[in-house]
Swiss-Prot record:
<keyword id="KW-0175">Coiled coil</keyword>
<keyword id="KW-0206">Cytoskeleton</keyword>
<comment type="similarity">
    <text>Belongs to the IFT57 family.</text>
</comment>
<comment type="function">
    <text>Required for the formation of cilia. May also have pro-apoptotic function.</text>
</comment>
<dbReference type="GO" id="GO:0005794">
    <property type="term" value="C:Golgi apparatus"/>
</dbReference>
<dbReference type="GO" id="GO:0005929">
    <property type="term" value="C:cilium"/>
</dbReference>
<keyword id="KW-0969">Cilium</keyword>
<dbReference type="GO" id="GO:0036064">
    <property type="term" value="C:ciliary basal body"/>
</dbReference>
<dbReference type="GO" id="GO:1905515">
    <property type="term" value="P:non-motile cilium assembly"/>
</dbReference>
<dbReference type="InterPro" id="IPR019530">
    <property type="entry name" value="Intra-flagellar_transport_57"/>
</dbReference>
<dbReference type="InterPro" id="IPR007110">
    <property type="entry name" value="Ig-like_dom"/>
</dbReference>
<dbReference type="GO" id="GO:0006915">
    <property type="term" value="P:apoptotic process"/>
</dbReference>
<feature type="coiled-coil region">
    <location>
        <begin position="261"/>
        <end position="351"/>
    </location>
</feature>
<dbReference type="GO" id="GO:0042981">
    <property type="term" value="P:regulation of apoptotic process"/>
</dbReference>
<keyword id="KW-0053">Apoptosis</keyword>
<keyword id="KW-0963">Cytoplasm</keyword>
<protein>
    <recommendedName>
        <fullName>Intraflagellar transport protein 57 homolog</fullName>
    </recommendedName>
</protein>
């Protein structure tokens, strides 16, 4: 179920979600290297360096989880919070809970179950470590330095020089050498030149105006051009940064693309036709399967309806079971109380102190009964005496009344 839910989440997030862990792991490894984790953690713990995809792929869950806990504790302490180094015998759930508490204290949200961290790999593990590393960089006020660009060495193209080809630099050097060698031979008298020029101008001005005609022989001119032409060739060194080179390359690439497009267009059209035919076959096959399985689909729907009804009845029965379970719990609690009272009474009955008290009470009761018997006897005796005394008095009174009657009768 967990794999299915994970695949469903990846489908919702897009096709690139499966590779997010690899990107986060690469960023995390760069940050750990900036924090010198190799010297402060690996050498002290005698561990191997992490690979580029250590926490992105499952290798050894126990080792990965221990490395995750070790790096988390080191980063938390380096960020300014106190956190004990986890040990191998510690409870993993408690360790994960403490790590997530520290993550929340830094202001990060935790929207995944803690069991994802218990595996020791995955996007959540990389996320937690990346957050801690980011907090450490903020705590130490890490700042990036300006990049230093290496000096690019221009590739000097070797130019093959023929006897008929000259470079600009060589031409300039030769011209400078000729000027320096012939400085003494080519002095010009400016005054004489100016006088000669004025004389020629005067002669030309004196001549009547006429049409100028060329006296040059065409054949000799062509021969001279062919003789001088090889020496006039100049090789210009190409610069890779020249925009003309880039334009030529663009034209070449465009021509190559056009050529490749002409070749591949036929294959693409053929592939398009094959895909269209395959889709048509799939759609027809799908219709055929739907027609064949229509009865089974209806049976499946009826089975689904029966299943939903059974689930509803089960929920109702579960509600009654829950109520009876609650009543049973109450009765069990009362039974436990009665058992406890019985145990207390049984323990008190086995004790000898109440028996002694009962014997003392019986003895006292017997003594009181004896006293009551004595008092009863005294009362009966007193009552008997009073009765006898009253009876004697009545007898005497009766005798006293009978004597006058007898005397009256005698007379």
């Amino acid at each position: 179920m967990s794999e299915d839910s994970r695949r469903a989440e990846d489908d919702d997030r897009g096709p690139g979600a499966a590779y997010q862990a690899f990107l986060m792991m690469e960023d995390l490894l760069d940050k750990l290297k900036l924090l010198s984790y190799e010297d402060e953690v690996l050498r002290k713990q005698n561990m191997k360096p992490l690979s580029r995809h250590y926490f992105a792929l499952p290798t050894n869950p126990g080792e990965q989880f221990y490395m995750f806990c070790t790096l988390s504790a080191w980063l938390i302490n380096k960020a300014g919070n106190n956190f004990d180094q986890p040990q191998e015998y510690d409870d993993p759930n408690a360790t994960i809970s403490n790590i997530l508490s520290q993550l929340r204290s830094f202001g990060y949200s935790v929207d995944f179950p803690p069991s994802r961290l218990k595996a020791g790999y995955g996007e959540q593990v990389c996320y937690v470590l990346d957050c801690f590393a980011e907090e450490v960089l903020k705590h130490i006020r890490f700042s990036w330095k300006r990049p230093t660009y290496p000096t690019e060495e221009q590739d000097e193209e070797t130019v093959v020089e023929d006897d008929a080809e000259l470079t600009l630099n060589k031409i300039e050097d030769e011209i400078a050498e000729e000027d320096s060698d012939n400085d003494q031979e080519h002095f010009i008298d400016l005054k004489a030149l100016s006088a000669q020029t004025q004389k020629l101008n005067a002669e030309e001005s004196s001549k009547p105006e006429e049409i100028l005609e060329s006296n040059t022989d065409a054949a000799e001119w062509i021969l001279e051009v062919e003789r001088v032409l090889p020496q006039l060739k100049v090789t210009i060194r190409t610069d890779n940064k020249d925009w003309r080179v880039h334009v030529d390359q663009m034209h070449q690439h465009r021509d190559g693309i056009d050529t490749s497009l002409k070749e591949t267009k036929g294959y693409l059209d053929k592939l398009h036709n094959e895909i269209a035919k395959a889709l048509e076959k799939v759609s027809s096959r799908e219709k055929y399967i739907n027609n064949q399985l229509e009865q089974l689909v209806q049976e499946y729907r009826s089975a689904q309806a029966q299943l939903s009804e059974a689930k509803e009845r089960y929920q109702q029965a579960s509600g009654g079971v829950t109520e009876r379970t609650r009543i049973l719990a109450e009765i069990t609690e009362e039974l436990e109380k009665v058992k406890q009272e019985m145990e207390e009474k049984g323990s008190s009955m086995t004790d000898g102190a109440p028996l002694v008290k009962i014997k003392q009470a019986l003895t006292k009761l017997k003594h009181e009964i004896v006293q009551m018997d004595i008092r009863t006897g005294v009362v009966e005796h007193t009552l008997l005496q009073s009765t006898l005394k009253e009876k004697s008095n009545m007898t005497r009174d009766m005798h006293a009344l009978n004597i006058p009657d007898s005397s009256i009768g005698a007379y």
